[in-house]
Amino acid sequence: MSTNQYDVLVLGAGASGLMTAYMAAQRGRKVVVVEKANKVGKKILMSGGGKCNFTNLYVEPSNFISHNPHFVISALTRYTNWDFIGMVCEYGIEYEERKHGQLFTLKGAKEILAMLLSECEKTGLVDIKTNCEVKAITALDEQGFQIATTLGYFEAESVVIASGGLSIPTLGGSGIGYEIAKQFGHHVYPTRAGLVPFTFSDSFKEVTTRLSGNAVDATLSNDLNSFTEALLFTHRGLSGPSSLQLSNYWDVGQSFKIDFLPTVDLHDYLKAKKHSQPKALLRTLLGEHFPKSVVVE
């Protein structure tokens, strides 16, 4: 079986894989991107509800969770959010700013994927192979690696793991990247869920089930961090941006607090209402801030 020769093999054709391929090709490297799914960029297309939250106006190293903060600083210095925004503007992709500086396309995530593929194509040095699953990687005696795939063998001087995490297996998520990293002596930290809802099995679940579909602004906090955004009640527990963000700083068995009136000093508020509306019922006052079903509960 013949072997295909490349300078760089990128494992995974998601956002990071396509950006890596484009950047390597800009430096004159011949690149092949291998993707086990039948299409590239599936997670890009579903991100942001199909509108792709492609970056943020306020990108700081402190926003990133990493065991190697120095790498985060270096990466964000060498390629900034404004560099990517500039590329988006060059392609005439319209976007909007939402809460907390989040940027979303107006016409859909397909525009971001098309942009990345176009940048790769313009270099003339990037090949993309779909339905191509990596089976084994072997270090060569002289230099580089041999990669066995379902489409044959490849050789490359460098291999980049951009296969993503374990989430959403139906979109191609798998543990192959972790296995390869371990194989070549890299330390792999234990994995755990992140950006996930909180689920409950006790009596509180009965409450969230009854309130399912209601959303309120709230602050969720623990000893490590706090987030003030929308909180969504579901039939299994709590979701919404505030829950998803705090889940990155929470582990099983730990507690967290919920402030349902983060912008209100409750003592001063009730004191003022006592004078302005002395006969008002508590549920009436709470109704100024929460949906009726939440107040009743």
Model-based region annotation:
Residues 72-80, 99-118, 129, 168-172, ...:
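Short beta-strand to alpha-helix junction loop
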Residues 130-143:
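A conserved short coil-to-beta-strand element within the FAD-binding core of flavoproteins
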Residues 25-49:
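Glycine-rich FAD pyrophosphate-binding loop
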Residues 38-40, 45-46, 55-61, 187-190, ...:
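An anion/pyrophosphate-binding glycine-rich loop and adjacent beta-alpha core
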Residues 9-11, 34, 134, 153-170, ...:
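Short hydrophobic core segments
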Residues 158-201:
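Glycine-rich loop(s) and the adjacent beta-strand/alpha-helix scaffold that form part
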Residues 6-33:
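N-terminal Rossmann-like FAD-binding beta1-loop-alpha1 element of flavoenzymes
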Residues 49-99:
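Glycine-rich active-site loop/strand segments that organize a redox cofactor
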